[in-house]
């Protein structure tokens, strides 16, 4: 028997600096909603908590660009995204926001409690400061000349022209974006969270879940732990955010870093939910009880924050505390969903936004298309043709066709009543092809296998459709009306089972089926009653009255319906290609001076195999590789951390300069150079020979 009496589900807080696109929905919000709806269907105590992440530099930059306050920006996108989620049937119990007073109070209380325990450290560092505006400047608020390509408009974190990642103090002639003045370097003090203090606890925590969590979560976490956890800044010099709740000059104009403040939004949002129930302390039952199971639905880019950093914050809060916060029990992190073979990208305007999609197509068609392509263990793809084919072939021709035929025939031939008793003997005679699906479906959802659950649900629909087609009640009724009545009694009970099984995936469609069957909403959702268990047996008795309603559940999507979307993609791709061509022309580096063949022969290029790979601490650019080079192994540092996870390079054959003089970087020696080329999107791709290249062999 489970140790848990209730489940608390959270979903990553979308950043309130733009609209949610289909990739976000597919990886995080839809699978969480399907899981939560299934738990409710079983009568379990479950709440779904979400909200908007409303602090950080990108929001202030957008506000500055538009000439409005950050609050105007976050209000716009919080409202747009929450409305789109609701329209798509994402059933949050509460959808909060990190700009709310409750959240600010919660985040400040956490900070003060951990500060009083002496866990934080403080460090003085130098940062650019605008004397005219009297503001410290984050990297994105500084512009200047790129030291690599000479672009005079490079940003303090990256040069958009050559793609080089920078820090603001590397820029030549830096200027403040606020005033255009030259900033000075000025000392500033910041608070740091010592993640290393919790290294052993986190190692034990991760290994304790190694058999139950997804491999991508375990691998990402182990990589960070293997590198050794260091101190991480939790404060910034910004005018927008949760104010550091301390008196004195040290804390003046400082806010909590968004990585620390955002995850606490799950707690503050739960507090707001409890207040809505008229029980302000009810949130404690979900956050401070060992009988609560906490689950974080996220994308793979958020693993470290939810598998390591948030647990570390809660561990710090729990030290010497009477009330103990629960730690996460599972982190079902998805891979990415791509769009027509390419990555979704808001910055490059290559995306389908949820609110725009729902203006043209029904929510349930989208929910099905995304759920059955859920990127559980690998990246998947959304395409308009696949969306059309699944809507027409599976939803319309299979599920919709069966339900409408069953309801229409009953209304026409049996006065809209269940015409016979569907006995348990008849029901059991359906065999393993029907009854075996219940266990498969339940186990899939309990273990977050959303695709498998969708396939199983559609198998139920195929079974029912085949049953009606092969039974041919429209023929049987002419000679054996009682047998036809038995067939239709079975078909209508199959309809109710389908309405229940599809309820987590297609909530709007499920409600329509129940309505046609004359099953009231009260009978569909009783607290504490396991409706999923009930529909494993027939529920509609002889004489039960249908509502008399009948409708086409899914309209087929014609080529003409999606052609505008395909045209839009073509325009997007053309614009991207033009932009990339212009960028390539702008960034084309002059050919270097001619060298002789003898000089070229001095360069020793070899095939090397990556044996180990990990991030270099305190930098977001470098990876440390251990490579096999023939009979020897070497350590090589490569600036590929922005483009590859360590796991992605493991076992990969790469091309390296084998006779380059060793060079010290970040206190480590790099014994060679891995070759890479920039692609059209400005991302570095490590050169990797095709075929079965021999490790250690020269490249010719």
UniProtKB/Swiss-Prot annotation:
<feature type="binding site">
    <location>
        <position position="146"/>
    </location>
    <ligand>
        <name>Zn(2+)</name>
    </ligand>
</feature>
<feature type="short sequence motif" description="'HIGH' region">
    <location>
        <begin position="14"/>
        <end position="24"/>
    </location>
</feature>
<dbReference type="GO" id="GO:0004825">
    <property type="term" value="F:methionine-tRNA ligase activity"/>
</dbReference>
<keyword id="KW-0067">ATP-binding</keyword>
<keyword id="KW-0862">Zinc</keyword>
<dbReference type="GO" id="GO:0000049">
    <property type="term" value="F:tRNA binding"/>
</dbReference>
<dbReference type="InterPro" id="IPR014729">
    <property type="entry name" value="Rossmann-like_a/b/a_fold"/>
</dbReference>
<dbReference type="Pfam" id="PF09334">
    <property type="entry name" value="tRNA-synt_1g"/>
</dbReference>
<keyword id="KW-0694">RNA-binding</keyword>
<dbReference type="InterPro" id="IPR015413">
    <property type="entry name" value="Methionyl/Leucyl_tRNA_Synth"/>
</dbReference>
<keyword id="KW-0479">Metal-binding</keyword>
<dbReference type="GO" id="GO:0046872">
    <property type="term" value="F:metal ion binding"/>
</dbReference>
<dbReference type="GO" id="GO:0006431">
    <property type="term" value="P:methionyl-tRNA aminoacylation"/>
</dbReference>
<comment type="similarity">
    <text>Belongs to the class-I aminoacyl-tRNA synthetase family. MetG type 1 subfamily.</text>
</comment>
<feature type="binding site">
    <location>
        <position position="149"/>
    </location>
    <ligand>
        <name>Zn(2+)</name>
    </ligand>
</feature>
<keyword id="KW-0547">Nucleotide-binding</keyword>
<feature type="binding site">
    <location>
        <position position="162"/>
    </location>
    <ligand>
        <name>Zn(2+)</name>
    </ligand>
</feature>
<keyword id="KW-0820">tRNA-binding</keyword>
<feature type="binding site">
    <location>
        <position position="159"/>
    </location>
    <ligand>
        <name>Zn(2+)</name>
    </ligand>
</feature>
<comment type="function">
    <text>Is required not only for elongation of protein synthesis but also for the initiation of all mRNA translation through initiator tRNA(fMet) aminoacylation.</text>
</comment>
<dbReference type="InterPro" id="IPR014758">
    <property type="entry name" value="Met-tRNA_synth"/>
</dbReference>
<dbReference type="InterPro" id="IPR023458">
    <property type="entry name" value="Met-tRNA_ligase_1"/>
</dbReference>
<dbReference type="InterPro" id="IPR029038">
    <property type="entry name" value="MetRS_Zn"/>
</dbReference>
<dbReference type="InterPro" id="IPR041872">
    <property type="entry name" value="Anticodon_Met"/>
</dbReference>
<dbReference type="Pfam" id="PF01588">
    <property type="entry name" value="tRNA_bind"/>
</dbReference>
<comment type="subunit">
    <text>Homodimer.</text>
</comment>
<dbReference type="InterPro" id="IPR009080">
    <property type="entry name" value="tRNAsynth_Ia_anticodon-bd"/>
</dbReference>
<dbReference type="InterPro" id="IPR001412">
    <property type="entry name" value="aa-tRNA-synth_I_CS"/>
</dbReference>
<dbReference type="InterPro" id="IPR002547">
    <property type="entry name" value="tRNA-bd_dom"/>
</dbReference>
<keyword id="KW-0648">Protein biosynthesis</keyword>
<dbReference type="Pfam" id="PF19303">
    <property type="entry name" value="Anticodon_3"/>
</dbReference>
<feature type="binding site">
    <location>
        <position position="346"/>
    </location>
    <ligand>
        <name>ATP</name>
    </ligand>
</feature>
<dbReference type="InterPro" id="IPR033911">
    <property type="entry name" value="MetRS_core"/>
</dbReference>
<feature type="domain" description="tRNA-binding">
    <location>
        <begin position="599"/>
        <end position="700"/>
    </location>
</feature>
<dbReference type="InterPro" id="IPR012340">
    <property type="entry name" value="NA-bd_OB-fold"/>
</dbReference>
<dbReference type="InterPro" id="IPR004495">
    <property type="entry name" value="Met-tRNA-synth_bsu_C"/>
</dbReference>
<keyword id="KW-0436">Ligase</keyword>
<keyword id="KW-0963">Cytoplasm</keyword>
<protein>
    <recommendedName>
        <fullName>Methionine--tRNA ligase</fullName>
        <ecNumber>6.1.1.10</ecNumber>
    </recommendedName>
</protein>
<feature type="short sequence motif" description="'KMSKS' region">
    <location>
        <begin position="343"/>
        <end position="347"/>
    </location>
</feature>
<dbReference type="GO" id="GO:0005829">
    <property type="term" value="C:cytosol"/>
</dbReference>
<dbReference type="GO" id="GO:0005524">
    <property type="term" value="F:ATP binding"/>
</dbReference>
């Amino acid at each position: 028997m489970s140790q848990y009496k209730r489940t608390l589900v959270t979903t990553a807080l979308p950043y309130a600096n733009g609209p949610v696109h289909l990739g976000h929905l597919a990886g995080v919000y839809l699978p969480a909603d399907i899981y939560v709806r299934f738990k409710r269907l079983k009568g379990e105590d479950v709440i779904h908590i979400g909200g908007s992440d409303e602090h950080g530099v990108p929001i202030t930059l957008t506000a500055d660009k538009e000439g409005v306050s950050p609050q105007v920006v976050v209000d716009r996108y919080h409202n747009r995204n929450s409305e789109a989620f609701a329209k798509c049937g994402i059933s949050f119990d509460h959808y909060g926001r990190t700009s709310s007073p409750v959240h600010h109070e919660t985040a400040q209380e956490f900070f003060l409690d951990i500060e009083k325990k002496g866990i934080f450290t403080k460090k003085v560092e130098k940062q650019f400061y605008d004397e005219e505006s009297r503001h410290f400047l984050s990297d994105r608020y500084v512009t200047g000349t790129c030291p690599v390509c000479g672009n005079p408009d490079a940003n303090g974190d990256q040069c958009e022209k050559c793609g080089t990642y920078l820090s603001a103090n590397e820029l030549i002639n830096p200027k403040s974006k606020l005033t255009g003045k030259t900033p000075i370097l000025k000392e500033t003090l910041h608070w740091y969270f010592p993640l290393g203090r919790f290294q052993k606890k986190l190692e034990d925590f991760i290994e304790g879940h190694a058999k139950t969590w997804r491999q991508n979560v375990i691998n990402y976490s182990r990589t960070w732990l293997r590198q050794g956890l260091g101190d991480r800044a939790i404060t910034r010099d910004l005018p927008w955010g949760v104010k550091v709740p301390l008196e004195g000059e040290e804390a003046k104009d400082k806010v909590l870093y968004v990585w620390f403040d955002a995850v606490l939004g799950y707690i503050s949002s739960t507090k707001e939910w409890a207040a809505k129930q008229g029980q302000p302390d009810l949130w404690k039952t979900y956050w401070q009880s060992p009988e609560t199971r906490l689950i974080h639905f996220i994308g793979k880019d958020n693993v470290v924050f939810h598998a390591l950093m948030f647990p570390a914050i809660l561990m710090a809060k729990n030290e010497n505390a009477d009330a103990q916060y629960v730690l996460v029990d599972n982190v079902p992190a998805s891979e990415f969903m791509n769009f027509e073979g390419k990555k979704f990208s808001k910055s490059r305007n290559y995306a389908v936004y949820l609110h725009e999609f729902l203006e043209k197509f029904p929510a349930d068609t989208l929910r099905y298309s995304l759920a059955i392509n859920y990127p559980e263990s690998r990246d998947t793809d959304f395409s308009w043709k696949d969306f059309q084919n699944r809507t027409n072939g599976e939803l319309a021709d299979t599920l919709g066709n069966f339900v409408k035929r069953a309801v229409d025939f009953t209304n026409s031939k049996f006065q809209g009543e269940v015409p016979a008793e569907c006995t348990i003997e008849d029901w059991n005679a359906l065999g393993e092809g029907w009854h075996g699906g219940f266990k498969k479906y339940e186990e899939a959802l309990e273990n977050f296998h959303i695709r498998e659950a969708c396939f199983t649900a559609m198998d139920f629909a195929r079974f029912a459709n085949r049953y009606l087609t092969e039974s041919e009640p429209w023929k049987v009724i002419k000679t054996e009306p009682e047998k036809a009545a038995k067939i239709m009694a079975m078909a209508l009970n199959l309809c109710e089972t389908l309405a229940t099984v599809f309820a987590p995936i297609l909530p709007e469609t499920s409600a329509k089926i129940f309505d046609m069957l004359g099953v009231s909403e009260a009978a569909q959702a009783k607290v504490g009653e396991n409706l999923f268990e009930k529909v494993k047996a027939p529920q509609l008795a002889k004489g039960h009255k249908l509502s008399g309603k009948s409708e086409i559940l899914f309209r087929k999507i014609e080529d003409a319906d999606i052609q505008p979307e395909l045209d839009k993609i073509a325009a997007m791709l053309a614009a991207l290609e033009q932009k990339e061509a212009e960028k390539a022309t702008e960034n084309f580096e002059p050919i270097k001076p001619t060298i002789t063949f003898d000089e070229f022969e001095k360069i020793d290029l070899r095939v090397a195999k990556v044996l180990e790979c990990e991030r270099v601490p305190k930098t977001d650019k470098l990876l440390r590789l251990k490579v096999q080079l023939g009979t020897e192994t070497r350590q090589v540092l490569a600036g590929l951390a922005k483009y590859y996870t360590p796991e992605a390079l493991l076992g990969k054959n790469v091309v390296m300069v084998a006779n380059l003089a060793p060079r010290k970087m970040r206190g480590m020696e790099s014994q060679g150079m891995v070759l890479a080329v920039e692609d059209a999107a400005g991302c570095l791709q490590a050169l990797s020979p095709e075929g079965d290249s021999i490790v250690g062999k020269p490249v010719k």
